[in-house]
Amino acid sequence: VKTDSTAYFDSIFQPNRDSIEKFFDNLNQLGLFNGVILYADNEHIITEKAYGFAEVKPKDLLTVNHTFQLASASKPFTATAIMQLVEQNKLNLKDSVHHLIDSFPYNEITVEMLLTHQSGLSKYTHFCDNPDTVWMNKDSTITNENVVDIMHDIIPPLASTPGRKHYYSNTNYILL
């Protein structure tokens, strides 16, 4: 329930376009921020702005349309999406990954093992960066599909027995 006092505090602490941009302008000028911001309220974009460079050499300025690899920052989103599928009975944590991805070469690995880093899968960088790997286009970003194809083609050795121990490997979330 909004009262006069809470409405007053909301107006004081409500960030506006100018204050947000000034904050990031200052950080950028100090060399402390290089990236893209987007601030929205109730699905309404308040501000969207790029700061700094996408590439330092050559000096390609960032735009709001540049894409970034999120890396491990995407894991909570992936885990949440998987658990929503479980809640909707569209997926089971005990499902074999092989039944979900036909070309996946390991029958005993489950969705739950991928989520908890207990699949035993080695890090994809260990087998995809190998000079003997079928990944020929080393100058472009490898995709999740590329990793699955390589796993199918070379069947890399497992780092540990599936379900036995925790071994942090980004390969798990590539598959999810």
Language model: regions and residue ranges:
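Short acidic/polar alpha-helix capping motifs at helix-coil junctions
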Residues: 2-3, 47-48, 139-142
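Active-site-proximal loop and beta-strand segments within enzyme catalytic domains
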Residues: 56-169
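Acidic/histidine-rich, surface-exposed loop or edge segments in extracytoplasmic proteins
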Residues: 1-9
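Solvent-exposed loop/turn segments at secondary-structure junctions
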Residues: 45, 121-122, 173
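Short, conserved catalytic-motif segment at the N-terminal edge
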Residues: 9-68, 92-94, 149-158
